[in-house]
Regions:
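Charged, compositionally biased boundary regions
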Residues: 1-169
């Protein structure tokens, strides 16, 4: 007999959330036209973490520094949007991050569409990206800025890995 247990999101650490995020990114990146099987609990954890931890969200903004192409990251995040939807989770965080990669690919119109959900929620990153896009910042410049911050974000995630993922000062 199997007993289902609820995920205790309130007690999840930043380190645990990052491990789950990295695991799912790897699963998506390594699949080759195979059916993707991601645990529902993993999607719930990631959705919660991205809504409650700015460092984890910002970590996604610099994934190209970890050796992935802009196209690959955009593809991974697109799959994650679909996974969030299939798990009935809010998509505004992942769509906003995806908008930054779509912008880097030169599709400003597509990036603006992806920001809509975040802007409707008054999401700070969506508002910041809208200002960046409206100012016409070159995608290459934006990419360099994001990559430049990634090392600092990773350092902060390492430093705070034992803290709760929803720590109040995030």
């Amino acid at each position: 007999m199997t007993i289902a247990t609820a995920i205790n999101l309130e007690n999840m650490t930043t380190g645990e959330a990052k491990l789950t995020l990295d695991k799912v990114i790897k699963q998506i990146a390594q699949r080759e036209n195979e059916e993707l099987l991601v645990a529902h609990e993993d999607i719930v954890i990631i959705a919660y973490a991205l809504e409650n931890n700015l460092q984890l969200r910002d970590y996604l903004m610099g994934l190209t520094r970890d050796g992935l192409s802009v196209e690959s990251v955009a593809g991974i995040l697109t799959v994650m949007v679909d996974l969030f939807k299939s798990a009935y989770r809010s998509t505004y965080t992942i769509e906003t991050v995806l908008a930054s990669y779509v912008y880097r690919l030169g599709d400003s119109a597509g990036a603006l569409v992806l920001l809509a959900n975040g802007l409707a929620r008054d999401y700070s990153l969506a508002k910041l990206l809208l200002r960046v896009f409206d100012q016409g910042l070159a995608p290459d410049t934006f990419a360099m800025m994001s990559q430049g911050l990634h090392g600092k974000v990773v350092e902060e995630l390492t430093r705070t890995q034992e803290l709760l993922a929803n720590e109040a000062n995030r």
